[in-house]
Amino acid sequence: MKIRTIAILLLCMVFSMGASAYQTKKDMERIERLLADAQKLPKDSNLMLHFGKQFLNVPYVAHTLDLNMEEEKLVVNTRELDCTTFVENVLALTLCAQRGETKFTDFENQLQQIRYRNGKVEYTRRLHYFTLWIEDNARMGYVTKVESQYMPFTAVQHVKVDYMSKHVKDYAMLAAHPEWLEGIKDMESIITGNYYRYIPKKNINNSNILRQTIKNGDIIAILTKKKGLDTSHIGIAVWEKDGLHLMNASSIHKKVVIEPMVLQKYMEKHPSQIGIRLCRVVDLKKN
């Protein structure tokens, strides 16, 4: 009888998720608490930093979006984060809080718009490459690209992405659905051939010009020279006295941290990392 009761409860929980999303009651309660608490913050609060810090010490777990091999579902998981889902959750919370929204459904809808091209929940529309993530979220009016022809943006990235289509076995859902491959190739073709100015590793110092360029709470995309990829890691900018640090879901520390090392020193330990691109959350209150 007890086993049957548990089974019924589990089924109820699954159906309560709806047809398009996975989440737990804990996730829903946490999101609504965070959004309610944010309404009490001073108006000039840096919401990206505030919400990012609410996830400090949350465990790093990869592949949390690939729960259903049959079809893509919107996953809300605040208990386990990777570098991308950390940034997406923080951005979604920030945009909701700016609009004064406090309901989980508001957050869920915003996260869907951030994570998927044109907000359509499909594996081939998930913004797997962060270059396309930036382009799409800028087009949607959620972020602005921070770039310039001048210092410290002294280098240019020529994007050539095909890692997913060339390494299908590394992606469980894609390997299970070879019919999705053409959609992934189409996604890769959108950004392949594009050029973007970026801040090279050597320019990521504690200078006045860098402090003027990068603001607390900016989204930092670390670029890579690894063949077929555009970026290797993302996080949120945090300025401290000794320089620029990265708040991120770290596979090294196995949790969300503000990296103790300054970003330049961190990147020097990763020879394949060549520099950074930036985007900044739009201030909806000014629009």
Where are these regions (language model features)?
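Sequence/structural signature of beta-propeller domains
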Residues: 45-56
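Bacterial N-terminal signal peptides that target proteins for export
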Residues: 1-7
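Start-of-domain marker
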Residues: 27-46, 65
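C-terminal soluble interaction/assembly domains
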Residues: 215-287
